[in-house]
Amino acid sequence: MSADSTTKFGFVCVQNAGRSQMSTAFAERERERRDLEDSVEILTGGTHPADHVHEEVVEVMGEEGFDLSERTPREVSTDELESCDIVATMGCSTLELDAETVDVRDWALDDPDGQEMEQVREIRDDIEQRVVDLFDEFNPDD
């Protein structure tokens, strides 16, 4: 990422109620930690959004200092996703995006909905590392 350009990350899953919400929260934190608010945009959404973020996700993210209780899953369009530089899907997407303009990465993560809390924590920790790695890839000077 150069100082004069904006990079846009998209995090998407079907319901936008678990994995993509965790990814977004970690990306927002990483963007702030690295002082990249002016150069990194973050988009999140689902192809068939749920009514609320999964309770398990709210709880395990609360353990890490994130309050996702007021977040609302939202629908995301193909046009929105094609405006991203990178789109991370969570392993459940059948999106067909223009591969010439968007780098789509399938993170193939288990769905936390209905899982035991320890499994949800493992998914959370995996997501956190993937997000940090993504920022390292695009901002290696930190």
Swiss-Prot record:
Keywords: Arsenical resistance, Oxidoreductase, Plasmid. One of its GO terms (molecular function) is oxidoreductase activity. It comes from the Archaea. GO terms for biological process: response to arsenic-containing substance. Disruption phenotype: Deletion of the arsADRC operon results in increased sensitivity to arsenite and antimonite but not arsenate. It is an enzyme of class 1 (oxidoreductase). The keyword Mitochondrion does not apply. Induction: Weakly induced by arsenite, antimonite and arsenate. Its EC number is 1.20.4.-. PANTHER family: ARSENATE REDUCTASE (PTHR43428:SF1). Reduces arsenate [As(V)] to arsenite [As(III)]. As expression is low no effect on arsenate resistance has been found. Belongs to the low molecular weight phosphotyrosine protein phosphatase family. This is Putative arsenate reductase. It comes from Halobacterium salinarum (strain ATCC 700922 / JCM 11081 / NRC-1) (Halobacterium halobium). The lineage of its organism: Archaea, Methanobacteriati, Methanobacteriota, Stenosarchaea group, Halobacteria.
